[in-house]
Structure formats: structure tokens, C-alpha cells
Swiss-Prot record:
Gene: dapB
Gene Ontology CC: cytosol
Pathway: Amino-acid biosynthesis; L-lysine biosynthesis via DAP pathway; (S)-tetrahydrodipicolinate from L-aspartate: step 4/4
UniProt-recorded name of the protein: 4-hydroxy-tetrahydrodipicolinate reductase
Keywords: Amino-acid biosynthesis, Cytoplasm, Diaminopimelate biosynthesis, Lysine biosynthesis, NAD, NADP, Oxidoreductase
NCBIfam families cross-referenced by the UniProt entry: dapB (TIGR00036)
Binding site for (S)-2,3,4,5-tetrahydrodipicolinate: 146, 155-156
E.C. code: 1.17.1.8
Active site: 145, 149
Major enzyme class: oxidoreductase
Organism: Streptococcus uberis (strain ATCC BAA-854 / 0140J)
């Protein structure tokens, strides 16, 4: 018997990709699916539920969540309370919510993962950006996603800004007296760094980190052209959280 998995949001693009992946792994067993709008009672032989409360009696080890920002915290809290180790790709968590979930998981002795990005290339981009920030404190982030993404900026962009801030000398990027003739033209501001969000049909998930210095520039870019790019990270998350006793934020903490 493999690792028993519940997938929340199985009808979405990421959830359906995760379901296909899990069905092709010998050590994974999908035991339940959750979607509040699903009309079918089972899908490909797997029981389907509309209410998470109905999953309390399910014998499962891992809760995979690709739902929506407005329900992600509640779902993850529920999963930990029920003893399901969460692997969450849904973004939009606040810092306080993450702290709350880490504490709850520690109290319950349950592993878990909230990952802004499951692509290995995106993790490397963040690592390289952190190293570069020591030498290039002038930096801006541009993240580009499909036009159905509900939160902005992306969790990956926020995580990138967080890791950069560990090494970066905090400065205000741009002219101190600059004026926006059109409000929002300079994007969001995170500790003096500007973050810009692009939403267009045809995109999947992309990010650029632009560094500037006297007479030179450095651009780091990662592109996910297909949602398959995230599945290696999801596999790692599922296999690792069952060995842990506390939730972590960021896939890199399980590598």
C-alpha cells in the first residue's frame, strides 16, 4: 500500500495534473477527491466529496491542496487537525497564517509543506537571486502568470523578495523624489524593492529578477511552460512530509 492521498481542487489545472501524476506513481494511492462544485460521486473510481467535513473518517496520510487563496488557510488548518500532512501549492497565505499553521503542526506532530513554487528551476532562481543581492542591492522583480490567477503578486515573487532581503542592503529603489503620473506604475513595494505582476492568456508561470549596478546588469529568469514542471516538487513534498513533524514554508527546506 502506498502513501494515501486526498487531493483538494482536483478539477483545476494544477489539481488535475497532480491527480494524473499520483495515479502513475507506484507508492501513491489517491483515496479521496474534494471539490465543492463537483457533481459526480466518484471520478476514475475515486470517491468525490463536496464538503471537507465528510473527509474526517477517511484513512489518509497526505492532503494535497490546489484550491483558491480564500479557502487555503482553512483547508490546511483542517487537514492538520485531522492528522493529514498538507502539501499546499495554493498561494495567498499571510505571514501570520503561516506562523499559525507551523505552530499547529508542531503541536500535532504533523509534517507539512506550503510551497510558493514546486519547480526546481524556480528554487534555483531564488537561490541565485539571494547570492546576487549581496552585490546588487538595486533589484526589481517581474512575475508573469496566466490571466486566471487570483492573487498578485505571486507567492514565488514574495518568497523571492524575502530571500533577497536576507542578503540585500535595504535601500529605496529608484529616485527618492520619483512621482507616479499613473498610480501603481512602479508596482508593489517590498522593503524598497519593486514587484510587478503581469497577467495574460497563454502564460503559465514565469519570473524575472533584474539587478542593476554601475555600468552593468544581471537578469535571472525562470519559465514554466507546462504544469508538469511542478510535479517533481509535488512528488518530493508528498514523500517527505510523512517523515516530518512540523510544517515548513518552501520546498527548499525539504531538499
Amino acid at each position: 500500500m502506498g502513501i494515501r492521498i486526498i487531493i483538494a481542487g482536483y478539477r483545476g489545472k494544477m489539481g488535475s495534473t497532480a491527480l494524473s501524476m499520483a495515479q502513475n506513481e507506484e507508492d501513491f494511492e489517491v483515496v479521496a477527491l474534494l471539490d465543492p462544485n463537483a457533481k459526480e460521486k466518484e471520478f476514475q473510481g475515486i470517491p468525490v466529496y463536496n464538503l471537507k467535513e465528510d473527509l474526517k473518517t477517511i484513512d489518509a496520510e497526505v492532503w494535497v491542496d490546489f484550491t483558491h487563496p480564500e479557502v487555503a488557510f482553512e483547508n490546511t488548518h483542517f487537514a492538520i487537525e485531522q492528522g493529514f500532512a498538507p502539501v499546499v501549492g495554493t498561494t495567498g497565505f499571510t505571514s501570520k497564517e503561516i506562523e499559525n499553521l507551523i505552530q499547529l503542526s508542531s503541536d500535532k506532530n504533523i509534517g507539512g509543506l506550503i510551497a510558493p513554487n514546486f519547480a526546481i528551476g524556480a528554487l534555483l532562481l531564488m537561490e541565485f537571486a539571494e547570492r546576487a543581492a549581496k552585490y546588487f542591492p538595486n533589484v526589481e522583480i517581474i512575475e508573469l502568470h496566466h490571466d486566471q490567477k487570483k492573487d498578485a503578486p505571486s507567492g514565488t515573487a514574495l518568497k523571492t523578495a524575502e530571500v533577497i532581503s536576507k542578503e540585500r542592503q535595504e535601500i529605496t529603489q529608484g529616485h527618492p523624489d520619483e512621482v507616479e503620473s499613473l498610480p501603481g506604475a512602479r508596482g508593489a513595494n517590498y522593503q524598497g524593492m519593486h514587484i510587478h505582476s503581469v497577467r495574460l492568456p497563454g502564460l503559465v508561470a514565469h519570473q524575472e529578477v533584474l539587478f542593476g549596478g554601475p555600468g552593468e546588469g544581471l537578469t535571472l529568469r525562470h519559465d514554466s511552460y507546462d504544469r508538469q514542471s511542478f510535479m517533481q516538487g509535488v512528488k518530493i513534498g508528498i514523500r517527505e512530509v510523512v517523515k516530518r513533524n512540523q510544517l515548513v514554508y518552501g520546498l527548499e527546506k525539504l531538499l
